[in-house]
């Protein structure tokens, strides 16, 4: 009988929780601002972790770029705090990636809504 979750999935879930708390409470860099950890993917050997993040004002590319620079600069500090919070033999190297899926999802939703509205307007004319 196989396990429901792989160890890397469980570690990724715990990393997501811990990184979110660390970003909220410990990291004081003003460039980062309001950041949300949307997902974490961990390699099978737990050596690398991709941390997908979104920012509150994600329509401004300058804010996103500054926030990503701040996260990269704070990466070693975050990793140190993770080492204190989690009991792992190997603590993954952190790579922060801006998650555009939320923005793209909203854009697609708006496109679908516009198509539905234009289709309804056409049917009212007929």
From Swiss-Prot:
Instruction: Enumerate the Gene Ontology biological process terms.
Output: maturation of SSU-rRNA
**GO cellular component labels:** cytosol
The Swiss-Prot or TrEMBL record describes its family as follows: Belongs to the RbfA family.
KW Cell division (keyword) present: no
Q: What does this protein do?
A: One of several proteins that assist in the late maturation steps of the functional core of the 30S ribosomal subunit. Associates with free 30S ribosomal subunits (but not with 30S subunits that are part of 70S ribosomes or polysomes). Required for efficient processing of 16S rRNA. May interact with the 5'-terminal helix region of 16S rRNA.
Keywords associated with the record: Cytoplasm, Ribosome biogenesis
Keyword Metal-binding applies: no
Q: Which InterPro entries match?
A: KH_dom-like_a/b, RbfA, RbfA_dom_sf
A molecular function (GO) term: ribosomal small subunit binding
Task: Give the record's subunit note.
Answer: Monomer. Binds 30S ribosomal subunits, but not 50S ribosomal subunits or 70S ribosomes.
Protein name as it appears in the record: Ribosome-binding factor A
UniProt-annotated location(s): Cytoplasm
What the entry lists under NCBIfam families is as follows: rbfA
This chain's source organism reads Haemophilus ducreyi (strain 35000HP / ATCC 700724)
């Amino acid at each position: 009988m196989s396990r429901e979750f792989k160890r890397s999935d469980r570690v990724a879930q715990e990393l997501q929780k811990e990184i979110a708390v660390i970003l909220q409470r410990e990291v004081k860099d003003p460039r980062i601002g309001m950041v949300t950890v949307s997902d974490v993917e961990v390699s099978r050997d737990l050596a690398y972790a991709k941390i997908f993040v979104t920012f509150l004002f994600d329509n401004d590319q300058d804010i996103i770029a500054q926030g990503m620079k701040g996260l990269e600069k704070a990466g070693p500090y975050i990793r140190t705090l993770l080492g204190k919070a989690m009991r792992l033999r190997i603590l993954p190297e952190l790579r922060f990636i801006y998650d555009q899926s939320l923005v793209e999802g909203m854009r697609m939703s708006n496109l679908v809504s516009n198509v539905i509205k234009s289709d309804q307007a056409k049917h009212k004319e007929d």
